[in-house]
Amino acid sequence: MATNVKKVKKLRPKNVTVGIAHIHSSHQNTIISFTDKQGNVISWASSGSVGFKGTKKKTAYAATLATAAAAQKAREHGIREVIVELKGTGQGKEAARKQIITSGLNILLTKDVTPVPHNGTRPPRKWFKRQEKR
């Protein structure tokens, strides 16, 4: 009987020296993706893909491990310098930025692109109650 053989794609270096590090840090997870200037994803990782589950995904430690994993893959593809775009209000935002520095990538620019409504629609009721407690 024949067995199914799984084909493994060989990593081909993309030879991109300058990229963009998108860090999306929500209240429950942190997602890091490295792209080139056009927005094509080179590598990515999240707190869940590194192995954390449940409430541990939102911690700063989980964000640092996810950033280290994504940065390692990005370095294999040739990225040496990054522009960091931070989005969200989670715990892992600053921890992920610091981990990019310690992983050996040079930061050219840091931008905070968190969307802020300028008197848009009324927020959901659950969000409204959370603001009253503060």
Curated annotation (Swiss-Prot):
Xref: InterPro entries: Ribosomal_uS11, Ribosomal_uS11_bac-type, Ribosomal_uS11_CS, Ribosomal_uS11_sf
Cystine connections: none
Region of interest called Disordered, as start-end residue ranges on this chain: 114-134
Tagged with keyword rRNA-binding: yes
UniProt-recorded Gene Ontology molecular function terms: rRNA binding; structural constituent of ribosome
Keywords assigned: Ribonucleoprotein, Ribosomal protein, RNA-binding, rRNA-binding
Basic residues bias locations: 123-134
GO BP term, example: translation
Domain of life the protein comes from: Bacteria
GO CC entries: ribonucleoprotein complex; ribosome
Record note on quaternary structure: Part of the 30S ribosomal subunit. Interacts with proteins S7 and S18. Binds to IF-3.
Family as reported in the entry's similarity comment: Belongs to the universal ribosomal protein uS11 family.
Its biological purpose: Located on the platform of the 30S subunit, it bridges several disparate RNA helices of the 16S rRNA. Forms part of the Shine-Dalgarno cleft in the 70S ribosome.
PANTHER family (alphabetical): 40S RIBOSOMAL PROTEIN S14/30S RIBOSOMAL PROTEIN S11 (PTHR11759)
NCBIfam families, per database record: PRK05309.1 (NF003698), uS11_bact (TIGR03632)
Protein name: Small ribosomal subunit protein uS11
Top-level taxonomy: Bacteria, Bacillati, Mycoplasmatota, Mycoplasmoidales, Metamycoplasmataceae
Gene expressing this chain: rpsK
